[in-house]
Amino acid sequence: MNQKLFKQIKNEWRSNLWLALELFIVSVVMWYIVDYIYVSYALVHEPLGFNAEHCYRIDVGVLNEKSPDYVADATGEEWEEWRHTLEERLRQRPEIESVGLGFCCYPYDTSNSGTNLQYDTISPTGFIIKREMTPDFIKVFRYTGINGETPEQLAEVLKRGEILISENLLDMNENISGMTAKDLLGKDVYVNWDTTRTFKVGAVLNTVKYSDYMQGQMNRTIMLPIGTTSNANEWVVRVRDNMDKDFEENLRADIDRHFRIGNLYISNIVPFDRIRDSYLRETEQQTRNMFAGMGFLLLNILLGLL
């Protein structure tokens, strides 16, 4: 009986070898897919560090120079006054809670700006996101500090001309041992390769993710007060929680009457749930493809065992 069994195994060793190889390849692919899905699941359930619900991006355009309403030879002070007036008119709307201006810094932004930070001889390596903003930008996305600071308290830090750094700023730096971002609190640091001016670290933020699935260096952040609103390329607002309904339509209806100021006008209103969906579409499609691939492999394994 044993001889017959060994003889059968010997005769079928080639087919058994191919079966073992097939199972090995399937196992490796399955391990990769399961690992990818697990990591994605873990990432998407980590705190974002911001709240973009009830938030909108307000796109501000400039009149064409050929427009009969275009104000030629406007001074820098006039442009600044137009921007200030537009900001105040948005802020006066009863449904708007906060208005913020910034430069390449809102969540799910396809553009970003990098910087560095130096304290004494310590300088974190790798990419650090630089977010320049007005104080109320903090309130729009409700950033918070590691010591329980509220958005209002963090906004006051920016008003004082101090900066905010993320809790993970010094992570992933083997050359910085035993030091955390909290150790920089209250210290004067150099930012953006400029050693002629120092900024005081006024607070440490809870880690601010670049997007739901992002990890690593793209989540390291420095927030600075923006110099003037002329540097701002982004306008954002937070609408009161119970006043979202018809906000976009109502604001559009008032654009020509109240929001054409000098050469500036509101050109578009985009809710952040739409911005988020657009930014994450490719990643979420890839995750769905991974699920489909895992299901296909499991089906093949099941059919192979029958």
Question: Where is each model-derived feature located?
Answer:
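Intracellular coupling helices
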Residues: 2-7, 303-306
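Hydrophobic C-terminal alpha-helix "anchor/cap" residues
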Residues: 9, 90-91, 255
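Hydrophobic alpha-helical transmembrane segments of multi-pass inner-membrane transport and secretion
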Residues: 14-39, 284-306
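Short beta-strand segments
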Residues: 22, 57-60, 100-103, 164-166, ...
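Membrane-proximal extracellular/periplasmic loop immediately following the first transmembrane helix
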Residues: 34-125, 130-131
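Generic structural signal for small/hydrophobic residues in well-ordered secondary structure
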Residues: 40, 58, 90, 96-99, ...
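Hydrophobic secondary-structure segments that place a key small or acidic residue at a functional site
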Residues: 124-219
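"Rare, low-scoring activations can occur
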Residues: 167-171, 193-287
